[in-house]
Amino acid sequence: MAKEKFERNKPHVNIGTIGHVDHGKTSLTAAITKVLAKTGGATFLAYDLIDKAPEERERGITISTSHVEYQTSNRHYAHVDCPGHADYVKNMITGAAQMDGAILVVSAADGPMPQTREHILLARQVGVPYIVVFLNKVDMLDDPELRELVEMEVRDLLKKYEFPGDDIPIIPGSALKALEGDTSDIGEPAILKLMEAVDSYIPTPQRATDKPFLMPVEDVFSISGRGTVATGRVERGIIKVGEEVEVVGLRPTQKTVVTGVEMFRKLLDQGMAGDNIGALVRGLKREDMERGQVLAKPGSITPHTKFKAQIYVLSKEEGGRHTPFFKGYRPQFYFRTTDVTGSVKLPENVEMVMPGDNIAIEVELITPVAMEKELRFAVREGGRTVGAGVVAEIIE
């Protein structure tokens, strides 16, 4: 196999297949690898290779995910596909597989089904920004009017969850036919058409280094003769010596200047996304800062206590709770580097939440945390993880 083809000289995009069980997500994933393999952009992976997804553990949660990579003439893609519905829920909520866009697979024979809806809702809640639709199994429909009806249903459903339903590309085809080598419109050409839509409709994501600087504070030291140093791994952006930053979260926001950046005991002129650094800050004492705060570009992030979230509650088998929880539940919420206690408000018609459930909740923290939409967190009880969540909306 020509290995040297996979050079990282193309923009990289993370995508995944979502949609109802048995609508053809895994067959489509296999078909993409088969069709792109013809131009050397992929290694063909048969259905059963993708379907036997290895289990991974992300924050103590067991998730089965298949990772496939391939490239078009414009881009390099990492593609995730999950065997079971529960795996999708966990994957999207934990952010284990961050998606820049998704391919929603809908069977033309069945139309949108309950998990179609749930995956679109999850995509909205966890911040999957773009969706392209593959209308699968169109060979099972004789009536073109029926296909148009299904297409309209899908567009309406997307609009209901605030996706631009009218503008989203919907590509009709048959993943199975493409796998069989069919060269009619619904076979291999449909897969190529789908990839063109993915290439053009899903924008290249902003690189981590281009985003505003943020570093979660892991520890704070006082170094005699030098001052106060905050250590942590830069989550995004770049910090240059002499730049102003804000210390956000847990206490009133303070401004300071980074007067030095160290890495492996060497002085640098900047730290960037992915670096573990020590940042020397001007005019702050060791007791002015603590783990759980963040250093950030001024104005880029603010502290909040009330937010809406989508959470997945670990099952007993995953080491989660053995019993349900009710309204007024007060666990700790672990954001980045620290736990903050908060109280949970359940949706109106929900009395209790069972282990293994996935639900939208409202949280009020006792101290403010630097947060924004799409921030991931763990739900913990005395240091034990009992759930995973993502901020869907900030209230105050």
UniProtKB/Swiss-Prot annotation:
Its cellular-component GO annotations read: cytosol
Pfam name, any one: GTP_EFTU_D2
Q: Where is this region: G4?
A: 136-139
Positions of region (G1): 19-26
Looking at the record, the residues that make up the tr-type G domain are 10-206
Subcellular location per UniProt equals:
Cytoplasm
Q: Which reaction does it catalyse?
A: GTP + H2O = GDP + phosphate + H(+)
Which molecular function term from Gene Ontology is one that the record holds? GTP binding
Question: Annotated region G3: where?
Answer: 81-84
Task: State the residue spans of region: G5.
Answer: 174-176
Q: What is its EC number?
A: 3.6.5.3
Q: Which residues bind GTP?
A: 19-26, 81-85, 136-139
UniProt keywords (A-Z) are: Cytoplasm, Elongation factor, GTP-binding, Hydrolase, Magnesium, Metal-binding, Nucleotide-binding, Protein biosynthesis
Annotated segments matching region G2: 60-64
Q: What is its main location?
A: cytoplasm
- Classify the source by domain of life: Bacteria
Q: Where does Mg(2+) bind?
A: 26
Q: HAMAP family, alphabetically?
A: EF_Tu_B
Q: Which family does it belong to?
A: Belongs to the TRAFAC class translation factor GTPase superfamily. Classic translation factor GTPase family. EF-Tu/EF-1A subfamily.
Function field: GTP hydrolase that promotes the GTP-dependent binding of aminoacyl-tRNA to the A-site of ribosomes during protein biosynthesis.
Q: Which PANTHER family match?
A: ELONGATION FACTOR TU, MITOCHONDRIAL, ELONGATION FACTOR TU-RELATED
Q: How does it assemble?
A: Monomer.
Instruction: Name it.
Output: Elongation factor Tu 1
